[in-house]
Amino acid sequence: MIFNKTFLQTLFLLLALSCTYPPIEKKKLYYSKDKIEVFYQSRDILKKLGYEIDIFSPESFALSTKKTQIKKSLRKYDYIIFIKVNDHIELHLAVERNIFNRGSESNIGDSGMIIKQVESYMPIALQNKIFKPLEIEFKKNGYNLVVSR
């Protein structure tokens, strides 16, 4: 009985630690500045990091970037960063995975060879590649990262 319990606990721990595709994180940053100043600073940080702004709405304090592509070996992901400023800053990712669809020889070169699939999971290495530069820039500007996930 004790062996089974220990075995199950060990198995559960191994499964939990081996999860290479965790859910996409959501970041929260707290600030002590004026809300509109924070909103415009968030836009400037994204521009500084090379992102193009797609939606910019000062009325609702929300903005999003245009699609950006990131690769991991053969997999390609398109992602959008969404920022919402309330009493804190929320950073969200919307992710699509590009899947190469092997078709018949009659449709070689067809644009339908790549399927876009919306993802709620993404490799942690890619999430870090996206979020780390953002975290560094926000910390430089005096914002505090409090919550992840």
What label would you give each PLM region?
Residues 1-17:
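Sec-dependent bacterial lipoprotein signal peptides
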Residues 20-149:
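Ser/Thr-rich, low-complexity intrinsically disordered terminal regions
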